[in-house]
Amino acid sequence: MIENLGVGIDIIEVSRFRRKKYEENRNFYKKIFVKSELDYCLKFKNSAERFAGKFAIKEAVKKSISEKIRFLDIETSHLKSKPIVRIKKSREKYNFIASLSHENDFAVAVVISEKIK
């Protein structure tokens, strides 16, 4: 058994974010996404797809590690079209590999975490 590795997966309907418009639900979004994520997603006409993808990554991260962590302590970004994950305020240190895909009305994310000893 490999104790320092974890895997998380999450799938979400993009329409959940389409129905919950940012302009009308700012407090909801600010409880989940840090400023850099909000700024990134809101640049796009179809921001719901971006928000759903980032949410799926955050859920997958939470499932891949053993400690409880808040959404705002997980920050996602992109480098050359690949998701990057950073955690703030964690008892442990981790490396992450994340993958994200969108298809029709779904976003799915898979995250592999490695606890650094």
State where each predicted segment sits.
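Core catalytic alpha/beta fold that binds nucleotide/phospho-ligands
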Residues: M1-K117
